Amino acid sequence: MTSLPCPLPDRGASNVVFPDLAPALSVVAAYPLGLSPGTAASPDLSYSQSYGHPRSYSHPGPATPGDSYLPRQQQLVAPSQPFHRPAEHPQELEAESEKLALSLVPSQQQSLTRKLRKPRTIYSSLQLQHLNQRFQHTQYLALPERAQLAAQLGLTQTQVKIWFQNKRSKYKKLLKQSSGEPEEDFSGRPPSLSPHSPALPFIWGLPKADTLPSSGYDNSHFGAWYQHRSPDVLALPQMM
């Protein structure tokens, strides 16, 4: 028997047997050997692949050496989950708020006192003369008298009232200093009645020690009185 050469399948028969491979084979046959449609369409890809920079990377190679750290730094700075600060204890927050309030209170008080403090009134010599004369006449002014005096001197009623109050307090202090309370004297002398009165003597005419009766005299006198009594008088308590 003689073997007949097997005829090559027709292109139409291959399409029937392998319908999916037919378009690929037709496309490959249209380009030269070793080139794909992608490589033939973009000749720059072969150049980039030769240097190890495939087009599949989303970020191209850095232009300078310092820029190579930027992508990793961006990933570290912007993590997937946001950073949450640990919650502090509510009691600590209240304590801090109280400390802050206490630290602000003295400064506020100082500012208020500075704002409320009024300038000191300066009286002229003529005004002081009239005020002193009126104070010698009377230490307390009624409301009409105060208004009249304030109008005469060109002052307010409050200024006249405050001046009289200060003058009364000074006058009382002077009286206390002039009278002076008796201080304790440890020298053995009693305090004097007034600063100008003479000192009283320490001994007030007391009898001397030699004139005082002795204890022996008292005993002898009592013994003599006991001897002169009758026995009947002495026996009365026993009979009762």
Swiss-Prot record:
Branchial arches, molar and incisor teeth and limbs. One of its GO terms (molecular function) is RNA polymerase II cis-regulatory region sequence-specific DNA binding. Residues 116-175 bind DNA. The keyword Nucleus applies. One of its GO terms (cellular component) is nucleoplasm. The keyword DNA-binding applies. Disulfide bonds: none annotated. SUPFAM superfamilies: Homeodomain-like. Residues 44-70, 175-194 are annotated as: Disordered. Transmembrane segments: none annotated. SMART domains: HOX. It is found in: Nucleus. Its main location: nucleus. Keywords: Developmental protein, DNA-binding, Homeobox, Nucleus. May play a role in determining the production of hemoglobin S. May act as a repressor. During embryonic development, plays a role in palatogenesis. Belongs to the distal-less homeobox family. This is Homeobox protein DLX-4. It comes from Mus musculus. The gene is Dlx4.
